[in-house]
């Protein structure tokens, strides 16, 4: 039976339901898990900022996800990968690993640690030519067939790399079919570096707020977090992700009030490139706070301009009260 295999990498271990949930936690909680869709979640590690422990823990996270795929993936399944903050770094590492060596047969699961260390998160950088040689070797071991696995959708919220962890390869993620990366205009934690998604199939859009406002977590402005979650969910639905529809499943339905929430944080601002793609919710904020233009490039491209209409479609319509004709009311 063909199915969706959804993998979610969070950025920092926390207790779910305490108000510190990130968008990765929220998305995982919204998944409709069944025989047709299974999910895996990793809560992240507080040690990723330290070089020795950080690389070890990042490899362990990617290794757990890869092992889940080895044990559960079947040919024809769709793989969808999500990551928030530092979890976005691991999400891209797993995606690159799938595009290089694919998924090992279950009988080789004892090689997972080696594969992750050598080809997922190596200590030294490899050239594009070296990555191509690795892919060719993997195909040869697979009886000459292409062993790469496509990632149907890659969803990222302000993906970060702690300076202690190695830079990801610059070669494009050619196995990604579609994706979205929500990035924070107003910067992120000191010392971490924004990790751009190396694929022209991943739409990268800037959102108002700091890192926690886009990725979620402690100190986040929840209305802004909901806007970024809604955008990633919209792409996930289009890619085939099935979300719960029961009464306890609450998907975001942002409106103009949400776009005006919070204040412009004075944190480590990021320099946006010319013609940066901005989420249309920023335009709502600019009308009320034109001084925010100082943080933006001279030329921008507006993205997701129907976001308000999408929110209205997700909100159940209120019941329209019946209008009783005056003559009937008088007769009664």
Task: Describe each PLM feature range.
Residues 1-332:
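Active-site- or binding-pocket-proximal scaffold segments within functional domains
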